[in-house]
Amino acid sequence: MNTLMRRACRRALFPGSFRLPALDPLNGTLMFSSGNACAAPVGCWAPPSGQDTGIKVYNSLTRKKEPLILADPTVATWYSCGPTVYDHAHLGHACSYVRFDTIRRILLKVFGIDIVMAMVVTDIDDKIIKRAKELNISPVALARTYEQDFKQDMTALRVLPPTVYMRVTESIPQIISFIQQIIANGHAYSTSQGNVYFDVQSIGDQYGKFNDSFCDAASESALQDKRHIRDFALWKTSKPEEPYWASPWGKGRPGWHIECSTIASSVFGKHLDIHTGGIDLAFPHHENEIAQCEAYHQSTQWGNYFLHTGHLHLKGNEEKMSKSLKNYVTIKEFLKSFSPDHLRMFCLRSKYKSAVEYSKESMHDAVNTLHLISSFVDDAKAYLKGQLICQPVQETLLWQRLNETKVNVKAAFSDDFDTPRAVDAVLDLIHHGNRQLKAVSKESSSPRSPIVYGAMVSYIEQFLEIMGISLGQNQVPAEERHSAMLFNVVEEMVSFRSKVRNYSLATNESATAIGQEEKQQYKERRRQLLLEREPLLQACDIARQHLAVYGINVKDRGDTSTWELLDRKEET
């Protein structure tokens, strides 16, 4: 549906009530406005009973941050809209799931809140039926293929699986029962054609918690037997050669929205803590989900917190990345050029509810940020091992910076999971750590301070683990991970090269050779040695360049050398 059609449809459904959503200039999130009293933030949402977790979340129901209150502060129920499995998942899907996975990890690992998550797999849908016909296979075979494909993609991205996946086709009896109860409660009706519709007018001002320029009527334009244009299908009569299930209203299949309401209620009952999905699902999908659940449970607040991720779009294109617009990059295509860690850092650099631009520049920033962190960790570990000789360290200052970082990161997480602020706090700590890791040629007589750097490394690695990022061998694709034997070979190679390099530079040897000779004679002797051994020094440089081709980065630190194994995708 194009923009003009959406506007016309919206005016037909809600005359005089709505303005188009604007973009918040501060954070890039959508702002909704409405003349409908119930659609305003005031009066439609009440803080749930329970204990305040100390976390603020942006609740799309109120369009502002609210305290996260849970009946049990150690457990949260979470329903996530899942994939419609008719094709490969793309990068827009990946960003949404990675962002919510980050929030889930923060709740669990920072605040100690266990998550019970259910995710629906829509395995019967108009798109699935259409694609199956094009490929001349059954809708079931198509759906199972792409369901498995989706799960493989999520595993590759290190997205934690939900507590339970629920397929729509395995929940048909529950869906039929759910619809029957809504009819019995006076909020739905069946027609002579075998369709069942939700009666939007029956719930009055309870409808309209989310408002957008999208309209569900166009997708159901062929369904002409409903009472009001705003009514939406709960059950659709089957068409020739389409899959169907027997029901009290005849052969048919469920509507889109009823699937999620039924499955979420079957797992969590009449109360839900957290509901998540992309911003495009807020209206009509989540709007209709709420209407159905509250009509079924006869309640006024079924879900307490609705969180939505912003769209991903390509540079220079304001439209969201989507299959229908054919402007997408599949997850598998992305992983040919970048690692899961790169995507996770890309997502961390923006707020989860903000729109985000995918471009060469934004990915370059993510890659460089990871490399900066990895380099600091390697340097700090080299200092711990005594391989990096530095000037005296201001230990008290670094302890202070580390403690401040811990406070700032937790404060950022408590403030609607503000990952950009948390990453910036860690990068600031690294900046101060790097300022004092300056190599010198001779070791000072002052005592070393390895403990504070050990604590910094431990905290940074813990932070990355919470974010789902794994430096070191897990950042490198499995087929390229070095074995213990290869590790030892490289270690010996770098050690041998370091000895040859020190011999080539002739610093210690020339001083020993000249004994008490005059300063000028010392310089002349060393110059001669450097000229004689220059081919060896060049060979050392060439060896380092050749090792870099295979992802082995050798760092010369005074009279010692260290090495690290890099993900070669960082060079793309």
From Swiss-Prot:
InterPro entries: Cys-tRNA-ligase (IPR015803), Cys-tRNA/MSH_ligase (IPR024909), Rossmann-like_a/b/a_fold (IPR014729), tRNA-synt_1_cat_dom (IPR032678), tRNAsynth_Ia_anticodon-bd (IPR009080). ATP binds at residue 323. Keywords: Aminoacyl-tRNA synthetase, ATP-binding, Ligase, Metal-binding, Mitochondrion, Nucleotide-binding, Protein biosynthesis, Transit peptide, Zinc. Transmembrane segments: none annotated. Binds 1 zinc ion per subunit. Its main location: mitochondrion. A motif ('KMSKS' region) lies at residues 320-324. Zn(2+) binds at residues 81, 260, 285, 289. It catalyses: tRNA(Cys) + L-cysteine + ATP = L-cysteinyl-tRNA(Cys) + AMP + diphosphate; 2 L-cysteine = S-sulfanyl-L-cysteine + L-alanine; S-sulfanyl-L-cysteine + L-cysteine = S-disulfanyl-L-cysteine + L-alanine; S-sulfanyl-L-cysteine + tRNA(Cys) + ATP = (S)-sulfanyl-L-cysteinyl-tRNA(Cys) + AMP + diphosphate. GO terms for biological process: cysteinyl-tRNA aminoacylation. 'KIIK' region and 'KMSKS' region are required for cysteine persulfide synthase activity. This is Probable cysteine--tRNA ligase, mitochondrial. It comes from Xenopus laevis. The lineage of its organism: Eukaryota, Metazoa, Chordata, Craniata, Vertebrata. The gene is cars2.
